[in-house]
Amino acid sequence: MIGSFIRFDLTSWLPRRQTLLLLGFVAVIGILLPVPGMAITGAAIVTSLMIATPFLGDERGRLDTLYGILPVSRSSVVVGRAGSIVVFALLASAIAFAVTVLMASVRGGSLDWGLLLVIQAVAIAFVGLSASIQLPVLFRIGYTRGRLISYAPALLIAGLAWLAQAIGVLDGAQEAATGVPLPLVVGLGLALGAVGIVVGVLVAVPLYRKREL
């Protein structure tokens, strides 16, 4: 049931022009900005902003009402929607990595694979954080009333980074992170991303069950 919903969900919004433009934007970032890793960062931000897009499609196509009468559980809808978002995140990351490698080859530069893996791990953690914040809100109140939540994760990270820089915590954190093994950093990023998505799903399911469609 969940797999079928993921396929249905993806076909309802992934081929749309708005979604394809976002994926194209990821490629443009990697082409125009010479700094390796910027495309990966862009892919994470684009994924975060895109999380609300399927909910917009639900309201425009009255799919949210359809979910209420179909023999599909609310939990299957939540898990399926999270799964389709993960698919988009993987697609955006693949495009970002491919463009990064291609442009490094064209420009004749070398890539720091360790740095790219760290950036990717941080990007995955950010997507997980975004899902944990946005999914409960969007499943509870829908896109129209909850669309501004799309900007919350990026603003939260930017605010925390500014605060850390202002009080000097960021410099100390950078020095402390220098000696941390690469596998640990990558594993931590993957774990945080997975936990964020799981938390978002667990919180969203009971909220969605209470919502009248």
Locate each region found by the language model:
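Active-site phosphate/pyrophosphate-handling residues
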Residues: 65
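Short helix-to-coil transition segments within interhelical loops
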Residues: 68-74
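Alpha-helix N-cap/helix-start motif at helix boundaries, enriched for small hydrophobics
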Residues: 76-78
